[in-house]
């Protein structure tokens, strides 16, 4: 690799702090470094890079590498954002017989969900992990069956259930464990992505919260590794999310392109960036409309959705469909932008800028909006730092993080970029970040269309080399989507790890809910802009009366809007 390798100073500091601990080091790209370290030093190394060198834990995953090196492997991917911007992945090999490695979570809380998932999917034991509950697997899943092991199962067959009961224990961190009685309630499996929230309350005040997701886990990673070719996974990644699918397919294709050293033409890169910003527009306007709805301002809700329709028209003009599916391929993009389409898109962007400004002025001058959002759902900057939050969540808590600026990808190195942050740490701050990002997206769309490079759209004729790996990433509306791909020797992926932005934000929701009222819960959850379709139920536990009640989500939503006739009474 002839280009200058970034991250040398971090590596030197690591060698000085931990002599002899780094067993191997390799660059996948000029700014992506993977180091293999001695397993017993894993927590100390990750903590050192995280807190002392300015890293953020972007994704954590396992890999069954017994066919390659005789061991399992666990990867901790850190985005280095203090000084030189680069990626450092800390890798450890886990003995295939012992199956244990030291947990990083006690030192770096951001590792908690990733380590729980590695335990679920591979049966690897993070020794010292504070929360050993299942994360992904259901209660009735067999104990010794681990889906992502290479020799474990056929993804098309689901094993027979081992129990009919729901055994998951919801935890009240700030109360007595005897209050944690889990009621058995209905889950409507016809819903796209049900979730169960449990609020521990004293009267109307939320003492703590816990929640369980993954009720409809799709098993995409196993599907990709066993049944799909490289470009077929591109279309699967498009469908990770109904709103930010193009961000996921961009992150996936970029991961393979980085692994193979494929240089995507500049025109294709710029088109990717333009479409990512169109996707950001309709996502942010949707969230702003929902914020109006949760505060009882339904005229604002309808007006934001009216303006959002313009962004959907942009997508249809540029891509042929209101959803930007099926455009990315490894090596470039499938469809060019026509001159007349770009002219029409510029006109729509100008109109949208005027419409959004009018709506924002109306929104921020509405008294009820200020009363319901200022000081509500606070996310302390230290909590956001400890858990490596992303997107408007972390930016609204004083951390100016944005992958488009920190690690410019596709065409963003050529676009005018401004990172927005707020200091309020509350719901209104998250709304303001999204509002400012809407204006920035419109500016980038205009600039990209005016300065679209010439040249081809695709690179073709390359050969996939087995067992190459690299990261790909994109700044989706909710934060960065991180993909890691390792090529296989059968024209399929050996391993694909897909981490959506909301996955990085869920663990801190309980901190945002604490100290607020039950009627604020839907608004606080909505300010996270969670990437799931519905919440079927919420259980409210009165820690003083030691009673629990299952509240349908529609009833909680009504209470959030009307703030009368409490469902708890």
What are these model-predicted stretches?
Residues 1-208, 283, 365, 369-371, ...:
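Terminal low-complexity/charged segments
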Residues 42, 135-146, 151-569:
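Metal/cofactor-centered catalytic core regions of large enzymes
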